[in-house]
Regions:
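Sequence signature of WD/YWTD-type beta-propeller architectures
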Residues: 1-453
C-alpha cells in the first residue's frame, strides 16, 4: 500500500513510499532503470522509505521510460519474491503544487477546516487559511485563474460571510448577494483574462436517506449562472442562463474565453422529484469585450436522454478535451456511488469514460494541470467515506493512465488521517502565506457591494 503497480507518474513527484500488507521479519525493494539502481531495506514494519536524492536520480534516468521494481520479504524463515512490476515515468512534469480543503466527512457540523497547499515535489504542506482564524466558520470553493497562485478567490460562509478575491498583493472583500440574484455567488470559474469570473447562484438544500447507499442528498430548488466583472464589481447574466424553467449551474469558461459551458436541467418540484433531475452539458458564446452572451444555447451532451446527469465540467487548458462527472441524477455527485469521470473530445463531441481512472466508488471533483497532461480528482475508492486525491496522466489521445494516490512520507498516513480532501486544484507555485491578514480582512473590512447590472 498504496497500489503503485503500473501507474504513470511525473518526473518531479515526491518519493512513492509504500509498505507491505503481509507480515514479515525483514524486506527489501530494488528500483532500477538502466544503470541506475536503488535498494531499500526495511524491518518488521515493512515500510519502504525512499531517499529523496536517490529517487530524483532514478526519475531523471527514467523520464519517458519506466522503473522496474522488485520486492522481496523474509517470511517464515525464507525469502519470497513478489511479482515484479513497473512504474511508468512520463516526460511531462506536473504543476508543482496542489491546493485543497481539508474537512471532516460530515454533513452539517464541522469544527476545524482550512484551505491548504502541498508541494508535490516533496511532502511540505502549509495552510493558505484556517477557520480557527475566523471564528470556526465555513470556507469553500477556492478557485485559481489558470492555475495561477497569485490570482485566487474563496468564499466564507456563516460568520464573516463574504468572498475574498486575491490578485497579487491586492485583497478584496466582496459582498456578493444582490436583490436580483438567488444567493451569494457559489461555484466559480475564472475567465482566462482574469477580468471575469463565472458563478452559479443556488438555493441549496440537504436531506438524508434512511436506507440508501448514498448517505446524503444535496439538491437545488433553483439555480442560475452569472458572470462577475472583477474590475467594475458588476454581475451580468442572460435569460438563457437564468430561466425559471431550468436549473443552471457549474459554469466553466473555455481557455480562449469565448465560450461558457454549464450544466442545465429541466426544473422540477423539489425535493419530491430530487431523483428525476438530470443535467445536460450546454454552452453559450461570450464576448469578453462587451460582456454579452450569445442568443443560442448549444447542448453538447444530452445526458438526460440516457437517464444520466452531468456535473463539474472542466476544459483542458489546450482546449482539446472537456472532463466531467457523470452520475445517475442530480448535481451533487460527490456522494453518489455511481459517479465516474468522463471525457468529451471537443473536436468530435465524442464522449467516453476514463476507464483506467474510475473505480466502483465515487469519483467526483477534478481539475487539470496547466499543460493538459495531468488531472487530479477526488475519490472514495479506499473506504467509501473519505475523499482522497488521485493523480492521473492523460495521453495524447485523451485517455487516462492508471492513477496514483497522492504520496505521503508516512505510509500509514491515510489510515490515521480523519479528514477528506475537497476540491483538489493544481497550481503552478506556492500561494503567498497571509492567512491571518485574510482573516482580518474578512472580519474588519466593510467590503465592496457587488451590483447587478
Amino acid at each position: 500500500f498504496p497500489d503503485y503497480v503500473d501507474v504513470t507518474i511525473p518526473p518531479n513527484i515526491a518519493p512513492l513510499n509504500f509498505k507491505l500488507k503481509d507480515a514479515c521479519t525483514e524486506a527489501r525493494a530494488i528500483l532500477e532503470c538502466g544503470p541506475e539502481k536503488l535498494e531499500i531495506k526495511t524491518g518488521k514494519d515493512a515500510c519502504f522509505v525512499i531517499p529523496a536524492s536517490g529517487w530524483k536520480r532514478l526519475l531523471r534516468a527514467a523520464s519517458g521510460n519506466h522503473l522496474n521494481v522488485t520486492v522481496q520479504a523474509f517470511v517464515n524463515d525464507e525469502w519470497i519474491a513478489y511479482a515484479p512490476f513497473i512504474i511508468k515515468v512520463a516526460k511531462e512534469p506536473v504543476d508543482g503544487w496542489l491546493a485543497y480543503r481539508l474537512i471532516e466527512p460530515g454533513y452539517e457540523l464541522w469544527n476545524r477546516m482550512g484551505i491548504y497547499q502541498r508541494n508535490l515535489e516533496n511532502y511540505t504542506e502549509n495552510a493558505i487559511i484556517e477557520n480557527k482564524m475566523s471564528g470556526n466558520n465555513c470556507m469553500n470553493c477556492h478557485s485559481f485563474c489558470m492555475q495561477n497562485p497569485e490570482k485566487m478567490l474563496f468564499h466564507m460562509r456563516e460568520t464573516y460571510s463574504c468572498t475574498l478575491l486575491i490578485d497579487g498583493d491586492k485583497v478584496e472583500k466582496l459582498n456578493t448577494k444582490t436583490d436580483q440574484t438567488l444567493s451569494p455567488l457559489v461555484y466559480p470559474s475564472w475567465h482566462p483574462s482574469g477580468k471575469y469570473v463565472a458563478f452559479s447562484v443556488n438555493k441549496t438544500k440537504q436531506a438524508f436517506h434512511m436506507n440508501d447507499r448514498n448517505r446524503v442528498e444535496v439538491f437545488d430548488s433553483a439555480s442560475d449562472v452569472v458572470v462577475y466583472d472583477t474590475q467594475k464589481h458588476e454581475i451580468v447574466t442572460s435569460p438563457l442562463l437564468s430561466s425559471e424553467g431550468a436549473f443552471e449551474t457549474f459554469p466553466t469558461f473555455s481557455p480562449d474565453g469565448n465560450t461558457l459551458y454549464f450544466c442545465s436541467a429541466k426544473a422540477r418540484t423539489m425535493p419530491k422529484e430530487y431523483d428525476q433531475v438530470r443535467y445536460d452539458l450546454c454552452s453559450v458564446s461570450f464576448d469578453p469585450a462587451t460582456r454579452r452572451f450569445g442568443t443560442v444555447v448549444d447542448t453538447l451532451y444530452k445526458a438526460s436522454e440516457i437517464d444520466k446527469s452531468v456535473s463539474f465540467p472542466r476544459v483542458s487548458p489546450d482546449g482539446k478535451y472537456l472532463l466531467y462527472t457523470l452520475s445517475g441524477y442530480g448535481n451533487f455527485s460527490i456522494w453518489h456511488k455511481d459517479a465516474d469521470l468522463y471525457m468529451i473530445d471537443l473536436s468530435t463531441l465524442q464522449s467516453y469514460p476514463l476507464e483506467a481512472a474510475n473505480s466502483d466508488d465515487v469519483e467526483s471533483y477534478h481539475s487539470w494541470s496547466s499543460d493538459s497532461r495531468w488531472i487530479v480528482f477526488s475519490s472514495r475508492r479506499m473506504d467509501g467515506l473519505y475523499t482522497r486525491p488521485f493523480i492521473a496522466y492523460i495521453d495524447e489521445k485523451g485517455q487516462a493512465c492508471k492513477p496514483f494516490l497522492l504520496p505521503q512520507k508516512d505510509t500509514d498516513f491515510y489510515f490515521r488521517f480523519m479528514k477528506s480532501y475537497n476540491i483538489p486544484e493544481f497550481i503552478t507555485g506556492e500561494v503567498k502565506r497571509q492567512g491571518r491578514a485574510l482573516a482580518v480582512k474578512a472580519k474588519e473590512d466593510k467590503g465592496v457591494d457587488v451590483r447587478f447590472k
